[in-house]
Regions:
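Short active-site oxyanion
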Residues: 36-40, 59-61, 148-149, 209-210, ...
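Asp-based phosphoryl-transfer active-site loop
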Residues: 3-18
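Short, structured coil segments at secondary-structure junctions
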Residues: 57-59, 67, 169-172, 226-227, ...
Length: 264
């Protein structure tokens, strides 16, 4: 019996970077919640973006944000998994030195830091994704212990550019995962979306077999592998489809919505 449903957003429910979602999702999710199912939004997005996307039912959901590094209710942070300062600052310096074509940002549970308020990444995150942004002169000069994610950005081939040097340099010191063609997300070592879901499973005294997950990209693989029921949308990467127990129609055909309706 399914007691908790968790879904990714970008590429799974909507087009990457969109704040437009089929409104039928809201009514179907609301009915599932009325049946006693816990519904979790589980994305690489910031809380403010997830909150805006699900506005009609936002106070009924639980939120896993920033790729599994923050777990929260609509009003309270339950758990965070911060990065070591030396790690995210070292990553920042390497992108500057080795990947001049790429940009980057550092995230706290409530907002993100970027270094150029006029840059494409700043406008993309603020205007398309609905993120709360802060402009700073130099991210490496920040004195903070609440950085939970460092992300590298390139509009077309971030994973390709990061593969020769950046990923080998850091993949034993942090959890790295491609999140679409534009992003490589970096979390504290061992921290993924499944880490955050495991926290909720323990909190609600559930079993993995009572959990259903939906996803499309590499940062979804752990939760798709470990959940009792899991679906990759058919537009997902081949590795993700292989990790999931089932496949559903692509996001533009509302594949996840069809599966959710079958649970009513």
């Amino acid at each position: 019996m399914i007691k908790l449903i968790a879904t990714d957003i970008d590429g799974t429910l909507v087009k990457d970077g969109s704040l437009l979602i089929d409104p039928e999702y809201m009514s179907v999710i609301d009915r599932l919640i009325d049946k006693g199912i816990i519904f979790v939004v589980c994305s690489g997005r910031q809380f403010s973006s997830e909150f805006k996307l699900f506005a009609p039912i936002k106070h009924k959901l639980l939120y896993i944000t920033d790729g599994g590094t923050v777990v929260r209710t609509p009003t309270e942070i339950l758990k965070t998994y911060p990065m070591d300062e030396d790690i995210w600052k070292g990553m920042c310096r390497m992108v500057r030195d080795e990947l001049p074509a790429c940009d980057y940002f550092a995230a706290t549970p409530d907002f993100c830091f970027a270094e150029d308020g006029g840059s494409p990444i700043f406008h993309l995150l603020r205007d398309s994704y609905g993120f709360e942004m802060r402009e700073v002169d130099d991210i490496t000069r920040l004195d903070r212990n609440d950085i939970i994610k460092f992300t590298v950005f390139h509009p077309d081939k971030c994973e390709e550019l990061c593969t020769p040097v950046f990923i080998p340099a850091w993949n034993k010191k942090a959890h790295l995962a491609a999140a679409g063609k534009e992003w490589v997300d970096c979390n504290a070592k061992g921290v993924s979306k499944w880490t955050a879901l495991s926290y909720l499973i323990d909190r609600f005294d559930l079993l993995p077999d009572e959990v259903c997950c939906f996803g499309d990209n590499l940062n979804d693989i752990e939760m798709l592998q470990n959940a009792g029921i899991s679906y990759a949308v058919s537009n997902a990467r081949p590795e993700v489809i292989a990790a999931a127990k089932h496949t559903c129609a692509p996001y533009w055909e509302n594949g996840v919505l069809s599966v959710l309706k079958s649970f009513l």
